Design a protein with these regions (language model features):
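Core nucleotide-handling region used for phosphoryl-transfer chemistry
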Residues: 1-239
Length: 239
């Protein structure tokens, strides 16, 4: 296994408003989608992409395992499963640190979204299998049926779904007000080769979502779990 292989960059839909100057866009997405039998749409969560494999826990760079403070908990979890991973690489969204969205309904802080084995990205069913095997949750699957749609209908369905709040009560960290989900990630439900990644996975990101990486890292705060918010609300009621 090549320890240096990080997660591929996910190309944006051409109608994704949250692109930045260095983002990549799949202008031929519709042709790619016509070749995919079944799509899965999941909520894009606002966290750090972490990979767990037999060598350690990695953030975006796979040059060396991460030792950041906000990965301490997932690194402790890795210690328990590292000998069972073999060629399996688990990719998930680490929500231990709050970024641009404060989630108020989290039951845990790591959500699996992909599994790689050698030169293949495993199917969504296999992702769910390994999530259950290692006691992780998966990123939320969205109730979005886009089969047999025209391109215009498909585009509208993605845009409208992305306006929803999402599954974990997202709030803007600056205003404290409820906000929409960060975006949507679409993938082929079946397994596919690693080299085909740009043609099998697509994303839609809300406008003006991206904040400076330095901001959340320097002033990072631990994300609170749902039970902590419930306790806080209970204290307010008692007063």
């Amino acid at each position: 296994m090549d320890m240096q292989r990080k997660y591929g960059r996910t190309y944006h839909y051409p109608f994704s408003p949250g692109t930045t100057s260095d983002d990549r866009i799949n202008k031929e997405y519709w042709q790619d989608i016509q070749l995919i039998k079944r799509l899965i749409h999941t909520e894009k969560l606002d966290g750090e992409n972490n990979c767990l494999n037999q060598y350690g826990v990695f953030a975006r760079s796979h040059a060396t395992p991460t030792v950041s403070a906000w990965t301490r908990q997932i690194r402790q979890c890795w210690q328990q499963i590292k000998n069972d991973l073999g060629d399996i690489e688990l990719f998930g969204e680490n929500l231990y640190a709050t970024h641009s969205i404060e989630y108020r309904a989290l039951e845990q802080d790591f959500y699996l979204f992909a599994v790689r084995c050698k030169d293949m990205w495993l199917s969504w069913e296999e992702v769910k299998f390994y999530a259950a095997l290692f006691d992780f949750a998966c990123v939320p699957e969205l109730p979005l049926n886009t089969q047999n749609q025209t391109e215009a209908e498909y585009r509208l369905a993605i845009i409208e779904q992305a306006k929803e709040m999402g599954c974990f009560a997202p709030h803007d960290v600056h205003t404290g007000l409820p906000c929409s989900m960060e975006g949507i990630v679409t993938r082929n439900a079946a397994e596919f080769p690693v080299v085909q990644f740009p043609h099998q996975v697509f994303k839609y990101v809300r406008k003006n979502h991206v904040k400076t990486d330095r901001h959340w890292r320097v002033n990072w705060q631990r994300a609170r779990m749902a039970h902590e918010y419930r306790q806080e609300e209970g204290h307010v009621v008692l007063k």
